[in-house]
Amino acid sequence: MPKDQPTAIHRQDYRPPDYRIETVDLEFDLEPTATRVKARLAIKAAYDGGGVRPLVLHGDALELLSVALDGRVLGAGDYVLGDKSLTIAAPPASFTLDIETRINPAANTQLSGLYVSNNVFCTQCEAEGFRRITYFLDRPDVMAVYRTTIRADRQRYPVLLSNGNLVEQRELEGGRHMAVWHDPFPKPSYLFALVAGDLACNEDHFKTRSGRDVTLRIFVEHGKVERTGYAMDCLKRSMRWDEERFGLEYDLDLFNIVAVSDFNMGAMENKSLNVFNDRYILADPQTATDADYAGIETVVSHEYFHNWTGDRITCRDWFQLSLKEGLTVFRDHEFSSDQRSRPVTRIQNVRALRARQFPEDGGPLAHPVRPDSYIEINNFYTATVYEKGAEVIGMMQTVLGRDGFRKGMDLYVQRHDGQAVTCDDFAAAMADANGVDLGQFKLWYSQAGTPELTIEGKYDARDGSYALTVAQRCPPTPGQPDKKPMHIPLAVGLLDAQGRDIRLQLDGEDAAAAQEGRVLAVTAPQQTFRFRNVPKPKALSVNRGFSAPVNITLKQSGAERAFLMGHDSDPFARWEAGQQFATDLMLKRVEEIQRGAVSAYDPAFAEAIGHILRDEKLETAFAAEAIALPGADYLAERMAVIDVEAIHAAREALRATIAKTLRLDLERVFAANRSDAPFSPDAQSAGRRALRNAVLGYRAALAAEDPDVAPHLLHLYSAADNMTDRMAALRLLVDVAGAERQAALDDFYDRYRDDPLVVDKWLSLQAVSALPDTLDRVKALLGHPAFAMEKPNKVRALIGAFTASNPLRYHAADGSGYAFHAERTLALDPINPQVAARLLAPLGRWQRFDGDRQAKMKAGLQRILAAPKLSPDVYEIASKSLG
């Protein structure tokens, strides 16, 4: 390997730190271009044995001003200053180290460490940002108690915040002031936070179950406080839910949230001072959609839940990232399920998993939930670590039962509060609390790839038995050519001709053990489960509730799938039957398009959709999901060689078929779900809007042949009294060429030009348009005043939306989308390598396309890798993508 290429870090090389930092006293004198940081560290040796080991502190982009050991100022010969380190060769066993550095937050476009966003000082220290503030043992297994003093100009920065409790605040000379914060709970450096600025505040209170009165504050830019009410409500509901569901109570008297407009992530769980991308805090009916409200609920709860699963108990090393993230995503999924509709929440989570994580598991960037190596840890904040990690936790709950899982959580907290631990420690707590062996189950942490199940059911009328045979395999992934059989919890059911669940009695069980639906433990390469005393079944229902994140091959006719769509007692399986029915039809149409001979769609599918539309007992949010077709990304994953044009044509043809066949049903449902009531973000109201707009989507499928569609969409856009309905109409209109499209886009920008979050929606809508000139429009928008490469939200809204969410135009046969992607990656890398790397994944899927596209995608990756001074972030993704 050439010496200028970054090297990998391996999990197997973990060693405990040689030194521990017990207390940290920080002093900040804030100035945008020249902030001085003083750090006093109380350090003790943590190694056994003879000899003296060097102290090596991490540092990045720091100007070192002074170092003192036990009060003695060190000369240049007393330490070694490296490009990214500060080394003291032979320190004593216990000592105090004083370090003074100077940093330039205003120039920190990476948004890692201390930076300035809209005149607000802000930090982001996860994963390795603290080393950009001062020299430190910047690793998660070094936990210390922090005391932070902040000094700043009183007029420009009246609000001074850090972790823990405010213990002192006073005026200083020269128009400055100071605040001192103390966090009594030991924490790793990645959880340190500081915010200073001129901010408005929404204050509320929460009383814990033990009677503690907690002050809750959300800080935002002036003029935006009125848009924080929903986030505050979510926070209070999250605190109560965690007490009731897991017995976990908040532990300080103050909980602060700050929303900023420039942020690499969605939010950050710093102890008692959460910092949020403002898109996950600000909402009102005129600027936020139902999806935005749901996103706020998810992210606010997620970051609060980290107080115990992430802050009080943290990761030993970054390979254990899913210990906190997978567990906390599972917890926020459970919270949303309890607050809204559990079936609909499950469906939406599975849609997201299949769109983001399944392709990751099937591509060159596949990695286990607990990775074995990385070059840049920022690249492993992935769908696998988060979403698949959450599925692993969910399967634990399925295997152990809800009560058993709670016992495991209680033991985990009891054993490890205040510690930095591993995924194995969590699994051990679950196993020990329930007296079970999770050895095979833990392969979910170490094996990459999406397991594939082949399922076959056979009924024997002679003895009333049903044999269910399940074969499993996990395909090869980079570095893991051979896989062991997994422990897969598979929820199944059998339905009779009336759609009722048949009680299932496994061979060898007493009749009293029979249940309607069973969770089978699939543990071998192939197993057969035999059920006794089974009346003739009509249909087999598998992976109910999406009990395991697997792909399934199961031969079922259209009639069987239609029956399940109408009768399965498990809502997820009912939805899934429709998804698989539609997928089979559209993939068949793709093959026909490629052959040049197209037949009509099976009318049974449209009729099954009609039954859903006519079923007034169904929850509207579920009906909206049930009539929605699988996305192009899901269809692509089912193809050996992806054909984006044929997929698009097949989807549009099926949409049009449904629109024509069910026109009267669609019109009736659209009218029935209209409401004159004031906007409310509650689940029931959101469900009505979701169903009405899903129905509208089918009407729009006829735009090419019905000249009334575009004017109708423009009318609905103009008449909308909330952002959900306005965006729904505009999203459909951007795919229809004509004057109405441009009129609506111009009006939208004129209405919301002063609201950056809403303008982000305007950018994204244009980036995902199916029209042929979309890339030209995206390029033009790069020069629009609304866009800035320095702002991650803008980059994600325009460039990210085009490359990740517009497969038809991104994968244009001429390669223009790939060339644009490579060009923008190289432009963004020097500004913000973390964001540049995260947007690169679509280019790495080159192996799934035809030879011509493969060559063009590889050329884009090679162009990136050939660039000088490439960041480790982008280098890792690009090099692994090429293989």
PLM segments and residue spans:
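A surface-exposed beta-strand-loop module
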Residues: 46-117, 138, 174-175, 521-538
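Long, ordered, helix-rich scaffold segments
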Residues: 355, 382, 532-883
